[in-house]
Amino acid sequence: MTYDTKDKVLFSADGFGKFGALDAEEDWACEARRYYIGIVGKYGAQVQQVLKKAAALDIQIICPLHGPVLKENLSYYLGLYQTWSSYAVESDGILICYTSVYGNTKKAVMQLAEQLKNYGCPKVVVNDLARSDMAECVEDAFRYGRIVLATTTYNADIFPFMRTFIHGLVERNFQNRTVGMIENGSWAPQAVKVMKAMLEKCKNLTYCENEVKIRSALDDTSKEQLDALAKE
């Protein structure tokens, strides 16, 4: 990064950048968040150091390599970067990310989403990892403070799209979140065990006490577990 002391311009390289057409009317934060998490998300500590240096400068304009030149309300953009780079929670709500082979895990997820809304959750976001943009799913995980992972046991492991998703979280230093889990398996469900093992490198994760174990399809027992998770 370079600071022009004469015109008070910060040439921020990849920082504060985003993709997209400049003539499109769209919210800056949505694409900028995806861009940041995808490219810089792993390096929050380094971004924090840069922000500390930037705080001492009189910045009037920010010029990134990609995206619009920022000239107004710079505190808004700097504030978002502070949130993202410190792995803090940006938005209140619960994210549910799932994979479903025959539709039964999806039914459980949809029931959970409805229960969460009934219990007063301000926002519930549901992502089907097999059909959604994976980069946007990862972005959402860094946006919300609470996330539920729901997947099937597959070849004594977890369904590939969930594995890819969790790998995307871990390599970007996913942390400071509350995580709930739902597993589905016919005779030996072990998705929760696998997911927790994958997330071991992540810092400051709090796991919900209530976990949901589905044996192929929801029954009375797993429905009770689902309700307990929603209440938690």
Features from the language model and the residues they span:
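FMN-binding flavodoxin-like domain, especially the glycine-rich phosphate-binding loop
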Residues: F19-I62, H66-V69, Q111-N127, C137-E232
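Short N-terminal or domain-adjacent regulatory/targeting segments
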Residues: C63-E90, T164
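Conserved beta-strand elements of the Class I
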Residues: Y3, L10, G93-C97, G180
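Short gly/ser/thr-rich secondary-structure transition/capping motifs
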Residues: G79, V126-S132
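Catalytic core of the metallo-beta-lactamase
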Residues: M1-E26
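Short amphipathic alpha-helices and their capping/turn segments at secondary-structure boundaries
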Residues: M1-L10, L51-A54, M134-C137
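Cofactor-binding loop segments of dinucleotide-utilizing enzymes, especially the Rossmann-like FAD-
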Residues: D14, Y98-V101, L129, E183-N184
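Short, charged N-terminal beta->alpha structural module
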Residues: C97-N118
